[in-house]
Amino acid sequence: VGNKYVLFGTAWSRDSLRKGTYNLYYATADKIEGPYSDRRFAGRCLGHGTVFRDKKGQWWCTAFLNGKYIAPEELVKGVDAGTASSMNQQGLTLVPMSIEAVNGDVVVRALDPHYCLPGTEEMQQFTITQ
């Protein structure tokens, strides 16, 4: 994207296996071999999602039911299922994304308000670019 390489990865929000939400993160680099930036937040409940661009140029990420379903309104409030939790009620959800070069770097974010911010249980602190 632009002149940068973007590496996507996933992790549980509590940095513990199947605890919290399974999220999508990313890092950027000038060369494919790195060094890469610190981990940045890309989307909540998008873990193991596939990021792709459609024929019209819109970016998307697949999201899956991965854990106990909690309604998005409840998950945003910080409801703790005590185990893996997800707001994806169906087997597959397509979430619109924004991926763009900004000031020599890349900004990735989910456009759906339910997916765009880390939850209250997120162990890592992020500065979110809106």
Identify the residue ranges that each predicted region occupies.
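Carbohydrate-active catalytic/glycan-binding domains of CAZyme proteins
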Residues: V1-Q130
